[in-house]
Structures are given as structure tokens and as C-alpha cells.
Amino acid sequence: MQVKIESLAAQPLFALRVQGPFAQSLGPGFERLMAWSTRHGLQGQWMALYYDNPREVAPEALRADVALTTATTALPSDGEASGIRWDTLAGGLYALAQVRVIDNDFATPWVALFDQALPASGYRPDGGPCFERYLSDGRASGEWLLELGVPVRKS
């Protein structure tokens, strides 16, 4: 896995909070956000933001946001009633890795990033949510191309 360290600008987005095991909570969350964004004609990049470490937090307590990047700061009128909020992914220094997910196994690239690639980079996590940016839609095939992002600081 190749990791690059980049300074990213803050990214505005529409987000929907989900809680529970990631494999069970993210899909329904994305379906809700996709239906809502389609009703409003919104387009952007799809992301998932992760707030908890699954090695430290019980599966039922894991928090994540499913998100759609946006260029606007205006939340459509039914956003709050739908559980959707306007938010910003903080800018700053991130470790980024482009990975391929096979058979919907999203955990393996994250483990490789945190256990091997990130320590070898000379950087360490700096708090704040990690993210997945979806570069392809693998719903039908189970094969995804995505970018993993972790806020970092020099070790």
C-alpha cells in the first residue's frame, strides 16, 4: 500500500449519522442519503466518515456519517427532518491511500493502513474522523476503488 501525505482543504458535505456495526449501518444510511439527494438533484462525491475505532468501541456503538460532498452551504428545507445535516470535513494534513476492495472486505485495507503503511510513513493519527472516498460503485460486484484518508501529524 502506498501512502501519500497531503494537505487537504476543508470539504463541505451533506451528512447522515449512522450507528452500529459498519457492515450493517452504512448501506441503509447510503440508501437514505441517495434517495434524498436524488429528490433534490444533488451531485457530488460519496464518502463515509468514521468517528470510532472498531478495535476500541463495541460494534453497536460505532458512529459514522454517510456523506455527499457539496459546493453549497444551503441545506434543502427537508434536510433536518430527514436527519441530514450540512457539515464540513476539516481541512489539514492527511495520509491518503488509494485501495481496491474485493468481496466487500473494507476492513482489510484499513488494517493494512493503520498497522503497516501509516507507521512506516513517519506520521501518526491526529484525531478527527477518518474517511473513505468512493471512486467507483461496487454495489453490484463487491469490488470497489476508494481513497482512504486519515488526519495525521509527524511522529
Swiss-Prot record:
Name of protein: DNA gyrase inhibitor
HAMAP family named in the record: DNA_gyrase_inhibitor
Function: Inhibits the supercoiling activity of DNA gyrase. Acts by inhibiting DNA gyrase at an early step, prior to (or at the step of) binding of DNA by the gyrase. It protects cells against toxins that target DNA gyrase, by inhibiting activity of these toxins and reducing the formation of lethal double-strand breaks in the cell.
Main location group: cytoplasm
GO molecular function: DNA topoisomerase type II (double strand cut, ATP-hydrolyzing) inhibitor activity
Cellular localisation: Cytoplasm
Keywords in alphabetical order: Cytoplasm, Stress response
Signal peptide: none
Native organism: Edwardsiella piscicida
InterPro entries tied to this protein: AraC_E-bd, DNA_gyrase_inhibitor, DNA_gyrase_inhibitor_GyrI, GyrI-like, Reg_factor_effector_dom_sf
UniProt record similarity statement: Belongs to the DNA gyrase inhibitor family.
One Pfam family per UniProt: GyrI-like
Subunit architecture: Interacts with DNA gyrase.
A GO cellular-component term linked to this record: cytoplasm
